[in-house]
Regions:
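C-terminal structural segment of proteins
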Residues: 1-301
């Protein structure tokens, strides 16, 4: 059955949003919501948050506080441009956006939508979780509450957001210059991740890694930190033995399941390959694909 067209409201002043959201639903890029609508999800009145993007920059850096503020309502393209134009450095998020869907989707999709959809496979979430993000949420009375991203993610498609609340921005402690993101999907573009990994660390002058933070998607009910593997790496030189130990430690951090995209077995092998690849560049010999055989037979075994 074709859904009836919703009423679309497009505020440009953030102060108007809470009032308009009473009994309505937020929409940003619409790249998840419109798919849900086709599947029959109801949304009688939509409040389009993208009109708010003109009121502020996509990314701001507060050097004194050592913090980056990233808009939840700008398209991902604007966020990536903000990060590469010198507004701040966040290599893992920049890499995640570059591997996200396709240019057309990146020109529409937002971080707010990616967070609120609550998918364990969401591609911006590992970088934000690894960086220790805090989510700024506007409450129905126009107040502000802040919640750690780790507590915001409650389960598959479930987040800590009440009716009438909306996400205005995400704040992270300024990430180190060394970080990255890699995903494995069924193809290079327009692919939901079978698995994804974000990492960040400082590399000390003697080569040891400190402040190691890793987060992985599609291996648990929510995106998760790889705390055990990170602890193995902390303050160590990433020698072959240390990398082997960190890769072996991943099993304690993840609980993948078989689903229509990939088997748990395949995901465990990909998880090992992705971490090895993150730790052993740029010799070029340690690509994740070399550690997995992405055949349909294996994915389903
Ligand atoms: C072809 C295609 C390819 C895709 N590829 C990827 C991919 O590679 N990686 C990936 O992670 N995802 C992918 N997706 C999923 C989707 O693009 C992302 O989840 C995207 O970030 C959603 O953002 P949006 O702004 O479009 O959200 P919308 O669709 O506008 O909204 C999604 C949900 O979030 C709510 N919402 C939106 N913004 C806010 C806010 N600021 N505050 C409160 N609630 C809000 C809406 O009410 C709705 O429930 C893909 C989707 C499509 C259609």
């Amino acid at each position: 059955m074709t859904p009836t067209a919703p009423t679309l409201l497009r505020p440009t002043d953030p102060a108007d949003v809470s009032r308009l959201l009473a009994g309505a639903r937020a929409v940003a890029g619409g790249t998840d919501l419109l798919v849900q609508r086709r599947a029959g999800a109801e949304a009688p009145t939509l409040v389009d948050l993208t009109g708010l993007a003109g009121a502020r920059p996509a990314v701001t850096s507060d050097d004194a506080a050592g913090e980056l503020t990233i808009s939840a309502v700008h398209p991902l393209t604007d966020i990536a441009n903000g990060l590469t134009d010198g507004a701040g450095v966040f290599p893992a998020l920049t890499a995640a956006i570059c591997q996200f869907a396709s240019t057309t989707i990146r020109n529409r999709a937002t971080i707010g939508g990616n967070l609120v959809t609550g998918s364990p496979a969401a591609d911006t979430v590992p970088a934000l979780l690894a960086a220790g993000a805090a989510i700024d949420i506007v409450t129905p009375d126009g107040g502000l509450r802040t919640v750690d991203l780790a507590e915001f993610l409650l389960g598959p498609r479930r987040v800590d957001l009440a009716a009438g609340e909306w996400v205005t921005s995400v704040r992270v402690p300024q990430p180190p210059v060394e970080g990255g993101f890699r995903k494995i999907g069924g193809r290079r573009a327009q692919a939901i991740s079978f698995l994804n990994l974000a990492w960040q660390w400082h590399r000390e002058p003697d080569g040891r890694l400190t402040g190691v933070r890793l987060a992985m998607g599609s291996v648990a009910p929510t995106v998760v930190r790889l705390r055990t593997a990170a602890a193995v790496l902390e303050a160590q030189l990433p020698t072959q033995d240390v990398v082997d130990a960190a890769v072996a430690a991943i099993d304690a951090d993840i609980s993948p399941i078989d689903d229509l995209r990939a088997s748990a077995h395949y995901r465990r092998r990909c998880a090992a390959g992705l971490l090895r690849e993150a730790l052993l560049p740029p010799s070029g010999t340690a690509r994740a694909d070399q550690y997995v055989t992405p055949t349909t037979r294996e994915k389903n075994q």
